[in-house]
Amino acid sequence: MSITIKLGQLAEFLGATLRGDKDKDITGLAALQEAGPGQISFLAKSQYRKFLVDAQAAAVLLKPADADSYTGDALLVPDPYLAYARISHFFDPKPKGVAGVHPTAVIADDAQVDPAASIGAFVVIESGARIAAGVTIGAHSFIGARCEIGEGGWLAPRVTLYHDVRIGKHVVIQSGAVLGGEGFGFANEKGVWQKIAQIGGVTLGDDVEVGVNTAIDRGALADTRIGNGVKLDNQIQIAHNVQVGDHTAMAACVGISGSTKIGKHCMLAGGVGLVGHIDICDGVYITGMTMVTHSITEPGSYSSGTAMQPAAEWRKSAARLRKIDDMARRLQKLEKAVETVTCADNRSSDG
């Protein structure tokens, strides 16, 4: 797919201040050091300012404070990275679905599929499902009974929605994602695990994105709920009954145990793990590989574990950690000895 758009049109779309030729053709996007004629780029971080001198881009998105650093055509905006994000969709080569149903798709007689939806090859849509206008469902996807997909949703090939999954508007779900699988629920009877039926569903709000091979389990009783604007990276596990607040983002390999509640506008970096039945308040940032074992009630940044260091230093640190209990006992003895001597000295001076 190729697209050509005038620089002036981009300026109008962004509400940017245009400096240069409004009729210049823009045909693509590229990084500042790689952009060539016809491509627009951006300067978001000061360490890349050095590339402005030799930039070959047709135009650059700049903050007004950086305008004097570049003599070429530019669009001046408060946040160049955000502006780049907004115009990136003009140049997205992702194929657009064509309205209609592929002849190999299998659709239940009582399923409701809007004529403006695009249903790919070998898709299965079960009884009672409802597919809204503008939805694209990629090849070999499975939509279970009574599922609902809101307007403008985009499901890549090989997405699986078990029964009773409800999805809001403009949701993106990548290949291999499974929504509504059975939660991990068992009761122990004298050492034997008895399965608990998972009778809840999964509910996603509007503008949610779900990454490749991410799993969101159905609730045991009520639905597992993902709020509006939530962004989930690849290979994330969200267990039954979890609730995620609006506009929270999670990087790859996050694991969230059952019945945990995460607030709004939180960020969880890669590999974070959370135990079950805890609450995370709004506005929390959790750094990579952190293990969260209790509720967080105050906004802010949280970490656990040790950061990377040279292997030899790490081995020494690990060896010291094994001795920390012994070191603590020795320190307590020293403190008591010092306290005894101090008390004796005080008594002597008083006498």
Swiss-Prot record:
It comes from the Bacteria. GO terms for biological process: lipid A biosynthetic process. Keywords: Acyltransferase, Lipid A biosynthesis, Lipid biosynthesis, Lipid metabolism, Repeat, Transferase. GO terms for cellular component: membrane. InterPro entries: Hexapep, Hexapep_transf_CS, LpxD, Trimer_LpxA-like_sf, UDP_GlcNAc_AcTrfase_non-rep. Pathway: Bacterial outer membrane biogenesis; LPS lipid A biosynthesis. GO terms for molecular function: N-acyltransferase activity. The keyword Lipid metabolism applies. It catalyses: a UDP-3-O-[(3R)-3-hydroxyacyl]-alpha-D-glucosamine + a (3R)-hydroxyacyl-[ACP] = a UDP-2-N,3-O-bis[(3R)-3-hydroxyacyl]-alpha-D-glucosamine + holo-[ACP] + H(+). Pfam families: Hexapep, LpxD. Its EC number is 2.3.1.191. The active site is at 240 (proton acceptor). The keyword Lipid biosynthesis applies. It is an enzyme of class 2 (transferase). Belongs to the transferase hexapeptide repeat family. LpxD subfamily. HAMAP family: LpxD. Homotrimer. Catalyzes the N-acylation of UDP-3-O-acylglucosamine using 3-hydroxyacyl-ACP as the acyl donor. Is involved in the biosynthesis of lipid A, a phosphorylated glycolipid that anchors the lipopolysaccharide to the outer membrane of the cell. This is UDP-3-O-acylglucosamine N-acyltransferase. The lineage of its organism: Bacteria, Pseudomonadati, Pseudomonadota, Gammaproteobacteria, Pseudomonadales.
